[in-house]
């Protein structure tokens, strides 16, 4: 949900760092930590291959345990039949085993420096286009079916957190649902181009691709 506030790249990196800190605290206090992931059907809300998602978690944070919820729109796609359900659950179990037994490489400090810079630039670009642009709300209302979706009352919670009509009050689910209806998944990529471009300018030796 935090990707709605700062963009997917910045939100993902912040979540990664937070998971690392939680793991350190749990290890220090000898607590078994189980991280909960509320995965979305859309890429903008965490959707995507389960295998790559679990294998991209910080080393040691899966540790044989995880808790995941699937969004309602993907239940039929993954669990409609016994064979589908068996395959989906098998993917989860296998991914947890692999992430536990063969965890990913711990990020080097220079990798973290790159990600910190990319996260900063991405968040700034995202905010300048969405939160700071006075014309964006009008654009959003005109190009997406959000105004009509609000009248359907199809969600389990209100569309907005308050009576305000600004972007901040809109919940993440209707935000993504509106973009998905027009096949324009802006929240999944906005700000990433600026982050990559900035990184290529800063880290030019030996190769921007190697740094990234």
What do the PLM-derived regions correspond to, one by one?
Residues 1:
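Short loop/turn segments at strand-loop or loop-helix junctions that form parts
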Residues 54-71:
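Acidic, His- and aromatic-enriched active-site or binding-groove loops in soluble protein domains
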Residues 15-22, 33, 43, 47, ...:
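Extended, hydrophobic alpha-helical segments in both membrane/secreted and soluble proteins
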């Amino acid at each position: 949900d935090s990707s709605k506030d700062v963009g997917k790249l910045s939100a993902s990196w912040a979540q990664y760092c937070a998971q690392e800190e939680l793991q350190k605290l749990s290890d220090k206090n000898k607590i078994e930590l189980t991280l909960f992931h509320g995965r979305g059907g859309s890429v903008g809300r965490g959707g995507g291959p389960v295998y790559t998602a679990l294998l991209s978690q910080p080393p040691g944070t899966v540790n044989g345990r995880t808790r995941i919820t699937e969004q309602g729109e993907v239940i039929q796609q993954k669990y409609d039949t016994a064979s589908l359900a068996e395959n989906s659950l098998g993917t989860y179990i296998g991914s947890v085993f692999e992430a536990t037994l063969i965890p990913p490489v711990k990020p080097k400090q220079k990798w973290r420096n790159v990600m910190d810079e990319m996260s900063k630039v991405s968040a700034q670009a995202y905010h300048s286009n969405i939160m700071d642009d006075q014309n964006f709300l009008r654009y959003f209302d005109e190009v997406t079916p959000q105004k009509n979706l609000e009248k359907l009352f199809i969600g389990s919670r209100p569309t907005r957190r308050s009576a305000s009509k600004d972007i901040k009050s809109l919940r993440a689910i209707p935000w993504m649902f509106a973009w998905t209806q027009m096949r324009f998944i802006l929240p999944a990529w906005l700000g990433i181009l600026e982050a990559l471009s900035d990184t290529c300018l800063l880290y030019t030796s030996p190769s921007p691709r190697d740094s990234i």
